[in-house]
Amino acid sequence: QNFNYIFEKSDDPLFHRQKVLNEMIMESDTEIVVNYDCDVILPMSSYESAYKAIREGDCDVVYPYGQGMYQKQVQANDGICSDFLMSRDYNHLDEVSKIHTSDYGWAQFFRKKVYVEGGMENENFRAYAPEDKERFYRFSMLGYKVARIKNYVYHLEHSRGENSWFNNPHMQSN
């Protein structure tokens, strides 16, 4: 079985993403795990290169997109997303994208052993927080082999709720 579904009900208005990610990491029985935001799409070659770099021992952590002007901000609607899913033609996304900066979030491939040894996700962060930068610096400073693939990340733009922007009630303590 390649897929396991777990549902965890919560009435807490705060989505404690880092805690949920840590629980999923510990449930995983694979050598490689991916911290993957649901609003991004990568070129297939990026998935393959990131996986291969860890599998072959070249890296412990891989950011499957470049740093700098490597984000394609996609202003997509349901029709464009459906067209892309049916055809797998990235031109559908490119037509409604603009280039923007990319840094630390979206997706990271990890050797699971390294992710656990390095402390996994920092549960002291709550809601929207600078956890993406903290994670990058922590794993780099701990001496793990962190690399990037110089390719684009497609970020599906969306509205922001209480848990997903700078104005969340926990930002000051993060």
Language-model features: where?
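Conserved glycosyltransferase catalytic-site signature
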Residues: 17-22, 39-40, 47, 103-108, ...
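Glycine-rich, basic loop-to-helix element that forms the pyrophosphate-binding segment
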Residues: 11-27
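Short, high-confidence coil segments that cap the C-terminus of an alpha-helix
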Residues: 30, 58-60, 144
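Active-site acidic short loop of glycosyltransferases
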Residues: 28-31, 120
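C-terminal catalytic/acceptor-binding lobe
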Residues: 124-174
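Short beta-strand-to-loop acidic/aromatic patch adjacent to the donor-nucleotide binding site
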Residues: 31-41
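Acidic donor-binding segment of Leloir-type glycosyltransferases
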Residues: 1-11
